[in-house]
């Protein structure tokens, strides 16, 4: 709350800029060369927005797929996706209408995206699509994926600590695309090696990983578990 007294406020904190991701470089090319990591709010969420904006205008990009859970009131993310669709890219958006407190906003954004020619998928019956992933299809085949623990939401990215990996790793990118295949064709037999995807295999694989560390400890080998979770 703002009580009107400057002496009761913390100094305004600004995100750290990453020198290798400055304005005069192609982020798509940088990601294709090496994985990039963003930790918001300590790093700027604008890097992700720049990736979408560049993809929307690039002649090398043929498609963009993304999941959306919560959106900012004046979402630059959606604006970039609409720009991409108007520039002839095939854009697919999976939007979760059951995002608590944001149902009405998500419906409004869905209509705007559909009007722009974006293929909008309203989740999967019986499941809630909570993942935050983006797949950018390149004409050269050097596709890119973004995997985030937080919403693609400019406001959230200024308050919540979240992690985002932007990668061109073929195995990871392929599996991110498989998640969209599963969403578009619900309950199709899709298996994952690189990603932990619920409700398919996540719980069983987590338990197996925990049991592995228990066995390591019992055998006198180094063992540890470090995990960051939002809810159990």
Regions found by a protein language model. Give the residues of each.
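Structural motif
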Residues: 41, 228-231
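N-terminal localization/anchoring segments of enzymes in phospholipid and broader phosphate metabolism
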Residues: 1-223
């Amino acid at each position: 709350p703002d009580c009107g007294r400057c002496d009761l406020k913390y100094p305004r904190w600004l995100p750290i800029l990453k020198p290798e991701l400055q304005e005069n470089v192609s982020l798509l090319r940088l990601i294709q060369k090496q994985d990039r990591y963003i930790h918001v709010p300590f790093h700027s969420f604008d890097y992700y927005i720049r990736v979408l904006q560049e993809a929307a205008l690039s002649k090398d990009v043929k498609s963009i797929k993304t999941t959306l859970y919560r959106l900012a009131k004046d979402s630059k993310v959606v604006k970039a996706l609409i720009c991409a669709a108007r520039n002839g890219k095939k854009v697919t958006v999976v939007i979760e209408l059951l995002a608590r407190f944001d149902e009405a906003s998500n419906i409004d954004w869905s209509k705007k995206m559909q009007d722009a020619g974006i293929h909008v998928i309203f989740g999967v019956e019986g499941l809630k699509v909570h993942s935050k992933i983006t797949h950018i299809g390149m004409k050269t085949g050097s596709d890119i994926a973004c995997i985030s623990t937080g919403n693609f939401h400019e406001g959230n990215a200024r308050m919540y600590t979240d992690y985002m990996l932007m990668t061109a790793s073929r195995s990871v990118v392929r599996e991110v695309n498989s998640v969209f295949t599963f969403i578009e064709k619900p309950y199709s037999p899709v298996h994952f090696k690189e990603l932990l995807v619920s409700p398919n295999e996540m719980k069983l694989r987590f338990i197996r990983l925990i049991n592995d560390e228990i066995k390591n400890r019992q055998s006198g080998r180094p063992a540890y578990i470090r995990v960051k979770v939002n809810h159990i």
